[in-house]
């Protein structure tokens, strides 16, 4: 894991590549592109309303906590975004 990241969110042309690398095609339509924070792409799940934050290369995952992005495992990130009961 790396140190927490603080960066402003910018919105521009959607970058779907990181999401396409980590999710099966049948799940992609459940996400909205929300923007970018530094090198982290931000996607929001339409049903759970939770964010899936993925590095631009699709290799690292982050949770937003106390004003910073903290690296988590892929399993933790996917479980968080898919589970409304947490």
Predicted regions, residues:
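Mixed-charge, Lys/Arg-enriched low-complexity segments
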Residues: 2-24, 64-86
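Acidic, low-complexity, intrinsically disordered interaction modules
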Residues: 22-74
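Compositionally biased, low-complexity segments enriched in small residues
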Residues: 1-2, 44
């Amino acid at each position: 894991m790396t140190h927490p990241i603080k960066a402003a969110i910018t919105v521009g042309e959607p970058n779907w590549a990181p999401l396409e690398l980590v999710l099966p095609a049948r799940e992609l339509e459940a996400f909205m592109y929300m923007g970018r924070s530094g090198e982290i792409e931000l996607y929001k799940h339409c049903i759970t309303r939770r964010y899936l934050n993925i590095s631009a290369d699709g290799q690292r995952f982050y949770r937003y906590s106390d004003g910073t992005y903290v690296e988590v495992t892929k399993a933790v990130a996917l479980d968080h975004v898919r589970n409304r009961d947490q």
